[in-house]
């Protein structure tokens, strides 16, 4: 118990000495040991790394989870060391709504079939988003969080310890300076004509006491200087480790870009497949024209089928041979044609469509009754339907 009280009193004395030294430094009444320029640069770089890492971490969390309530919930689960429950993505929720709507409105109708197809694509988008969030959290967010909660806390602890060692060192310097000044004053030879013998003896005793005080202060200064140098070296090594942190974060950033590229490539592929599937749906993107034959009531079904003109928008309903024949018989409209540059490669879904290669030039035009998302494209002797989204129309 007595030992604990002595230690408590000693700690209180050290704390008071540091507080006095810190206050006098702030008011310019005490000298302060300055760190070298290289050390100051290391401190500034470490602080900058910590600040920007926090900002990047927070904004990446917002990117992956825009809902602030969900982010708070995930944060609480992590602090409680509990597994974060699986959360349905917005794409998966939209897919469920579309599937339910198709079931209620009629899955066999054109609208219902389209809802089902779009729901499948949205579900795939939601799954891709879930994989991206999981991959980005492991490969990018976790290393950043580990730096802030691990390495940076160690650096901060050692920096605080270095600050205390510096205050102790400067306090010892101030104490030694005062002791030397008092010793110099005490060792001044008194005037025997004005000084009584008794005062002379007291002056000699005081001089001896101040000599002991100077020796003690010098010993404390040497110990404080050694501890300060040792702590400065430890802190310097930790600060120089920030370079390794930058290398690690650079590798993690490459992983994040890779996962994000994979995610958007999957989304593009899913939507491209969806667009092709919707383009092949009969009755979904079908344009019609007025029949050139007599009314069906005055002709037989065979005669009506033979006399009905076939346009490219319904060529997919006919056999391949007939579809090709009909496309060859289609003539450009009187309003003229336009040139278009192909933006992306496109694989024809059937014989009524024209396969495209990126950056090639083709001639395009529209026919009455065609869906606005499609045009007729010509390249040499070949012609067929092409999606507008794959083209850049030239003036």
Swiss-Prot record:
Encoding gene per record: SH3GLB2
Residues found modified as Phosphoserine: 10, 395
UniProt KW keywords: Acetylation, Coiled coil, Cytoplasm, Phosphoprotein, SH3 domain
Annotated InterPro entries: AH/BAR_dom_sf, BAR_dom, Endophilin_B2_SH3, Endophilin_SH3RF, SH3-like_dom_sf, SH3_domain
Gene Ontology CC: cytoplasm; cytosol; membrane; nucleoplasm
Compartment list: Cytoplasm
Tissue expression remark: Detected in skeletal muscle, adipocyte, brain, lung, colon and mammary gland.
Subunit structure as annotated in this protein's UniProt entry: Homodimer, and heterodimer with SH3GLB1.
Coiled coil: 116-132, 206-240
GO BP term, pick one: membrane organization
Matching Gene3D superfamilies: Arfaptin homology (AH) domain/BAR domain (1.20.1270.60), SH3 Domains (2.30.30.40)
Residue span(s) of domain SH3: 335-395
Pfam families: BAR, SH3_9
Protein family: Belongs to the endophilin family.
Segments for region (Membrane-binding amphipathic helix): 1-27
Main localization, broad class: cytoplasm
BAR domain sequence ranges: 24-287
Name of the protein: Endophilin-B2
SUPFAM superfamilies associated with the record: BAR/IMD domain-like (SSF103657), SH3-domain (SSF50044)
Domain of life, per lineage: Eukaryota
Species whose genome carries this gene: Homo sapiens
Entry's Gene Ontology molecular function annotations: cadherin binding; identical protein binding
CDD domains: BAR_Endophilin_B2, SH3_Endophilin_B2
């Amino acid at each position: 118990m007595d030992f604990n009280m002595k230690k408590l009193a000693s700690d209180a004395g050290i704390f008071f000495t540091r507080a006095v030294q810190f206050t006098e430094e702030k008011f310019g009444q005490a000298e302060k040991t300055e760190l070298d320029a290289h050390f100051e640069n290391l401190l500034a770089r470490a602080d900058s790394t910590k600040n920007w890492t926090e900002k990047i971490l927070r904004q990446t969390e917002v990117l992956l989870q825009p809902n602030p309530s969900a982010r708070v919930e995930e944060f609480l689960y992590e602090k409680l060391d509990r597994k974060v429950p699986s959360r349905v993505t917005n794409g998966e929720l939209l897919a469920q709504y579309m599937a339910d709507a198709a079931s209620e409105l009629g899955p066999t109708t054109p609208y219902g079939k389209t809802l089902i197809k779009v729901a499948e694509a949205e579900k795939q988008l939601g799954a891709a988003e879930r994989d991206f969030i999981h991959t980005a959290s492991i490969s990018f967010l976790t290393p950043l969080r580990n730096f802030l909660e691990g390495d940076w806390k160690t650096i901060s602890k050692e920096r605080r310890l270095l600050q205390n060692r510096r205050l102790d060192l400067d306090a010892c310097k101030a104490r030694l300076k005062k002791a030397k000044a008092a010793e110099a004053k005490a060792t001044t030879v008194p005037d025997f004509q004005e000084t009584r013998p008794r005062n002379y003896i007291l002056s000699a005793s005081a001089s001896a006491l101040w000599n002991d005080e100077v020796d003690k202060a010098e010993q404390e200064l040497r110990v404080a200087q050694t501890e300060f140098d040792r702590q400065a070296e430890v802190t310097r090594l930790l600060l120089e480790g920030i370079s390794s942190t930058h290398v690690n974060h650079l590798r993690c950033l490459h992983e994040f870009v890779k996962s994000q590229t994979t995610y958007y490539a999957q989304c593009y592929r899913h939507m491209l497949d969806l667009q092709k599937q919707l383009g092949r749906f009969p009755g979904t993107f079908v344009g019609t024209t007025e029949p050139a034959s007599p009314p069906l009531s005055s002709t037989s079904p065979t005669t009506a089928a033979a006399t009905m003109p076939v346009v490219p928008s319904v060529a997919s309903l006919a056999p391949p041979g007939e579809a090709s024949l009909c496309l060859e018989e289609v003539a450009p409209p009187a309003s003229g044609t336009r040139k278009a540059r192909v933006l992306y490669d496109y694989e024809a879904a059937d014989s009524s469509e024209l396969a495209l290669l990126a950056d090639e030039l083709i001639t395009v035009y529209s026919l009455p009754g065609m869906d606005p998302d499609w045009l007729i494209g010509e390249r040499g002797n070949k012609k067929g339907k092409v999606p507008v989204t794959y083209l850049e129309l030239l003036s």
